[in-house]
Amino acid sequence: MDRVGVIAERPPLVLELPRPVRLGLAAGSGLLCSVAFPPWDVGAVAFVGLIPLVVAVEGASPREAAWLGYFSGLSFYLATIWWVINTMTTYGHMPLALSLVTLLLLCGVLAGYTAAFTWLLILGERWLRLPRGIAPLAAAGLWTALEYLRTFLFSGFPWALLGYSQHRQPTVRLLASAVGVYGISALLVLVNATLADLLFRWLRPPTAGGRLRGALLPVGLACLALAATVGYARVLWTDPTGGSPIRVGLLQGNIDQSLKWDRGYQTATLDIY
């Protein structure tokens, strides 16, 4: 397909949002995604939580998209890992003010990954002229790559990966045995980006090919991924022995964190287990 044909698949934008609205959508997206994590644990929200962020960066410059992504990531991590303040003050014996500063710095660094996601996404659309039908796939791959990078870069910080939000969703979490948490993250982002793409197509005036022209690829892949998830879960749920199911539980040793790493209590700690 030539350059003219590629550009033709990306009709003119219809969303001219004021900056305060974009900021509100970005921050709201971060807060919405945090609802999928403890203590709320509404995992289903993760399937739509990124849509406001995708809407916010639509039509933005790469630089503006980066700041919107940063703002979204900052709101998400502040709402998700705020509890580390208690850990730092109680067990690290840090002053409260210093704990707050440390939390802000930590969340600021982590938000950089979300900023990189939105920056690279818009950069790819602007410079590479990605067809809109490819954008959801690019978003899923880019997000997953950045999560993997965050797991190992600078000693790694694999907390609050998007896929972890499905730990209470038995159908989805079983997929982790095949593709890991990163595969679940990719599935969630693919669904979010596909739904956002459908929203843009619905808002755009109809063209000769219809609103949904070019959406078959991401929609088809998203449906296929969801169907494969359900099918894989049903296979794992099958009882191959025909015996009665058993329930397995895990119990923590309830070791006081102030004593956990004290060598003087090492033997007593092991005895508890």
Regions found by a protein language model. Give the residues of each.
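Soluble catalytic regions of membrane-associated enzymes that act on cell-envelope
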Residues: 233-273
